[in-house]
Amino acid sequence: MFRPVVGVLALLILASSCKKEEAKQYKVSLRATCFDCLVQYASGPDRGRYDTLAGFVEGTDTIRETGTYELVMKQDEALFFRACRIWPDSGSFGDIELSAEGDIEPIYHAVPAQEVCGVINREVQFR
């Protein structure tokens, strides 16, 4: 009778000590401004979130579209945020601007109209 009780207690103690510690999560707000761009964003190894920013021409003004996105990151993950022009000749309609803020130190990246893609791909500093 004593051995099974000791065995069960030992298993309970081992199971509770093996509990996986959860990593702290951080919220990050992303913003991309571009004319006719494909936006891709993720944290860590995942690269599967996409959006398209169209923009439009109104009279003699070119209006770039802005997309905002929310991302949840863990401490050891890198931020991946990219916007690439769908049509190479759409560069004449303005720069590509990328920014990230929230529970991280703010990041801003802009590329001139001649560039095809703007990319942020790096480790971030959490607050």
What spans do the regions from the language model cover?
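Short, surface-exposed beta-strand/strand-loop-strand elements in extracellular ectodomains
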Residues: L38-R49, S92-D103
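Short strand-edge motifs at loop-to-beta-strand transitions and within beta-strands
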Residues: D61, E65-L71, I120-R122
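A short, solvent-exposed beta-strand micro-motif common in secreted/extracellular proteins
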Residues: Q75-P88
